[in-house]
Each structure stands twice: as structure tokens, then as C-alpha cells.
């Protein structure tokens, strides 16, 4: 009798867990479709299907350590950590919504080589009325238009010019320091604003060890700037435990309702 009860309880819990996983999976898939309608056509069982014919595994069903998630994330992994829009407290320990990425996902959309990415770069004029600067970002998924819209709104806030008036860079095919992982700058979907008023966990703590605890969170970027970027599909590196307050990247799937 006891074995029967235990089996029934175990089966019930498994079904509950499966239902939760299914609900989360459906939510994640809707976010991807809403965020990237120009690139993603739909899903075939456990695969994301792209308009160019590529099929990428959505969930490899593996339980991973933090290090394994950084180095070998599937597409589901990059959606698990919730990015919260709006004003938030400092990030919780090792909470990095958006830093865990499936590189094949971004290479499929934006290009797998520098030459492929460059074919789709567009030049925008950043802050044309205050501190004009030519910046190159991808036109895929309308990133160039969204960043220009950010610029248009920031021009209405001249008091914050010192933070945004000297952008440190956009497209740059490179890896993240201390890793072999591509930076999102490689895909032309990221911008670093003025480093003179920014903070970065590696600089402040003189380490590249992602498993090391960071004693202090440091930020000088006003939230009004962050809100404008988020409105147009860009997440902020200041909401990462491994903070990078100069950094914004186009990740609408993490901002989709």
C-alpha cells in the first residue's frame, strides 16, 4: 500500500513538473516569435525553425552548472533568467539575465563570420543634434532603426549628455575578455556608452573569473537612460550580477510580455 501511495505521489509530482515545463516552453516560444518575426517562422517539436531553413535545438534537456550554461547554453537556457523591465534593485548573486546565450542562435540571424555580419551593417547618426557620431549596427531585425529611435529620445534629455555623448563602440567582432564566447558586439546588436561614467565588474574587481563573488555592485548610469533603451528592445548590462553599466544589447525576447 505504501509503495502504491509513493508511486502515485511521485507520478503526480512528475505530471505537475511536466505541466510547468510545458507552460514555460510555450511562453518562451511566444517571446521568440514576437521578438524576431523577420527571422523565426515557428517551431517543429523541439526545434526553432528559421526563415533561412536552419533548425536549432531549443532544449537539450541537460541540467547544467553556471559555467556550463555560459559555455554551452541551449536556446531555452538563454530565456530562463528573467530580465525585469523598469527600475530594479541591485542584481541578486549570479543573476545575469541575458549573459547566458546560445551563440548559434545569434549567428544564424546576424552572421557567423565578420564578413557575413558586415554585409548587413547600417550607419546611424548618434545624437545628431547634440554630439553627432557615426555608429554601425546591423539592420537585421530593425536594430538600426531601434537604436536611432533611442538616440532621438536621448536628445530630449541634454542633461544626460555626458553619459551618452561619447559612445565607446558598437560593431566589433571579438570575444568577451577571459572567455572564448563571442561578445554581442560581434553581431552588431550592442552599444557601449561613455566609459568615463561607467563601471564593469572585471575592471572594478581586477578579475575575469565568473565564479568569483563580486563584493560590491557599482553604477553611475541614470535610470532614465536605461528606460529609453528598454523601450526600444535593448537590455542593460547594469542589471547583471557581472555588471557592465556601459553596455546595452538588442534582446527583445527578454523584454517581450
Region spans (language model):
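Cell-envelope/glycan interface and biosynthesis
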Residues: 24-240
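A cross-kingdom marker for long, charged
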Residues: 231-257
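Bacterial Sec-dependent N-terminal signal peptides
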Residues: 1-21
